[in-house]
Curated annotation (Swiss-Prot):
Keywords linked to the UniProt accession: Heme, Iron, Metal-binding, Monooxygenase, Oxidoreductase
Gene: phqM
The protein, known as: Cytochrome P450 monooxygenase phqM
InterPro entries: Cyt_P450, Cyt_P450_CS, Cyt_P450_E_grp-I, Cyt_P450_sf, Cytochrome_P450_monoxygenase
Record CDD domains: CYP58-like
Length: 536
């Protein structure tokens, strides 16, 4: 329900009589009256988008997208490529006022630093807390907010968590060893979720909950976090679902969602400490996310306003930093183990770099390894963490794509346009043999030319703010794990790695491995044995 020029506006039109029993004003949250024949005819035939090809049901109702995203579990964006081919058009209609564009030059325009394409309000406000980074629509406001938080995610701050990363790797090693000795398969994706959760918490809050230290490395909170992401599309269509989660009374929340309630309590403690520090004017140690929240709205009138729901925003940061990085780490492990030549070349590079991986751990040198970098970029291309739609509004004056004109539309039927990362990473005019895992494409002159198409962290002013931490984890974890352990895939293949689009990608089954040996331990025994023989 939205405020229109003639009163309240709902899915089927203006409402000027709030006393009417059928008024949208009196309908419960989440209610959506099925579109009438008149509305369907208007949507399908009379709107300016009527000439854009696409499924007829998609033109009539947004519930067509609901069916493919919610009921069929994230299948809609996977169908766009075949729809573009079916209708032989770079633009297809995917909703009553929404289109998808498969055109690399348009993608570059939409995600440029000077883009005029603003975020689509309903999608992003459903996912982000009010006033939070994900839901800020105005570019100027977003830039101010991002600049305010930038020090927290800057390279210098990320460098400060390297000691924690080394500690996390040592804890992970114990879990690897346990599975090696028992010869039990290891769910490495679950382990990586705990690892990345700890690292994000260390950066955001200045302390880690030690999720990875929980026995098998899969803390109940991290498991709950994984389950929560399964409902991402449901939250987009019914935003109140997420609100319920964060506004349950503690007594009821402890019964229905104890892990989230524990996190909520901890966040409220951090928030209270931050307010106390701001009021006292005494800042001890590194500022955390809640310290930055406390400063919002405290400056001049031009300053960024505060976040209405800081706990929810903190949860969004944690979810984004956990799931996407863990998915990329797991996909990297799969691609390395599934491609013997890649495995061989990577081992050669890692073995030549043992001085700063094993002997004197140096994150900067690890992040400069060329072939490892190419492997990670190719993983982010072929297994991109956010493959689907990031919807935007067509700017004033409209835009022409090929021979198709897209009008800006009028409220509330503004034209929504998207150009998915999937359409870029599988484009055979950009990437030769796009479905093949070829790290070499990112090396040499070809690699320099492809850099503008490295979209793993998106592009433009809305690019992932946490990319520095993600890169640190991707490089250092992959280098350490594959330098130290011999392993093989267990019940993991191309079919289990097929993904669904839950805003972020989710493979059908977690990546599992068998730990075959500890190479460093074998080398230590070999050296010790050689020394003993010499003494004899």
């Amino acid at each position: 329900m939205k405020q229109g020029t003639t009163g309240m506006y709902c899915e089927v039109g203006p409402c000027t009589n709030a006393k009417d029993a059928h008024s949208p004003c009196l309908r419960p949250p989440g209610y959506a009256k099925p579109p009438t024949v008149r509305v369907c005819r208007t949507r399908g035939h009379n709107l300016p988008l009527s000439k854009v090809p696409g499924p007829k049901l998609a033109a009539l109702t947004k519930w067509y997208g609901f069916y493919h995203n919610v009921i069929r579990d994230g299948q809609y964006s996977l169908s766009f490529s075949s729809l573009h081919k079916k209708y032989d058009s770079p633009v297809i209609r995917i909703g009553p006022n929404a289109v998808h564009v498969d055109d690399p030059s348009f993608y570059q325009e939409m995600f440029s630093m000077t883009t005029k394409y603003y975020k689509e309000p309903e999608f992003y406000k459903a996912l982000g807390a009010e006033g939070a980074m994900a839901s800020i629509l105005d570019p100027k406001h977003h830039r101010m907010y991002r600049n305010h938080l930038r020090p927290l995610f800057a390279s210098r701050a990320v460098d400060g968590v390297v000691p924690r990363l080394k500690l996390e790797l040592e804890k992970a090693t114990r879990i690897f060893d346990m599975h090696r000795k028992d010869y039990h398969p290891l769910n490495i994706q679950a382990l990586y979720r705990s690892f990345t959760s700890d690292m994000v918490c260390e950066l955001l809050f200045g302390e880690s909950p030690d999720f990875i230290g929980d026995g098998n490395g899969y803390h109940p909170f991290v498991a709950a976090l994984d389950r929560f992401t399964a409902f991402s599309w449901l939250v987009v269509y019914f935003p109140w679902v997420k609100s319920i989660q964060f506004h349950l009374p503690f007594g009821l929340g402890d019964k229905l969602a104890p892990e989230f309630n524990d996190f909520k309590r901890q966040c409220e403690t951090w928030e209270a400490k931050a307010q106390l520090k701001r009021e006292s004017g005494v800042q001890v140690g590194q500022k955390n996310l809640f310290d930055y929240y406390a400063e919002l709205g405290a400056g001049p009138e031009t300053a960024v306003s505060g976040v209405a729901q800081p706990v929810e925003d903190a949860f969004n940061f944690l979810t984004a930093g956990t799931e996407s990085t863990a998915y990329t780490l797991s996909s990297t492990a799969f691609h390395i183990l599934n491609n013997p030549q890649v495995f061989k070349k990577l081992h050669e590079e890692l073995d030549a770099s043992v001085d700063f991986i094993r002997n004197d751990f140096n994150a900067k040198q690890i992040q400069a390894l060329p072939y490892l970098g190419a492997v990670l970029k190719e993983t982010m291309r072929l297994s991109t963490a956010v493959p689907g739609n990031l919807p935007r509004l067509v700017p004033p004056g409209g835009v022409t794509v090929g021979s198709v004109y897209l009008p800006e539309g009028t409220y509330p039927q503004q034209t929504i346009v998207s150009s998915s990362h999937l359409s870029i990473i599988t484009n055979d005019t950009i990437f030769h043999d796009p479905y093949k895992f070829k790290p070499e494409r990112w090396l040499g002159e070809e690699g320099k030319d492809l850099e503008r198409w490295h979209v793993g962290f998106s592009r433009g002013p809305r690019r992932c703010i946490g990319s520095s931490l993600a890169y640190l984890e991707l490089f250092c974890v992959t280098a350490y794990v594959f330098s130290r352990f011999e392993m093989s895939l267990f019940e993991t293949d191309e079919s289990s790695m097929q993904w669904v689009d839950r805003i972020s990608a989710r493979n059908r089954k977690d990546v599992q491995v068998r730990i075959l040996s500890d190479r460093w331990e074998k080398e230590a025994h070999s050296i010790a044995g050689g020394t003993l023989l010499k003494e004899e």
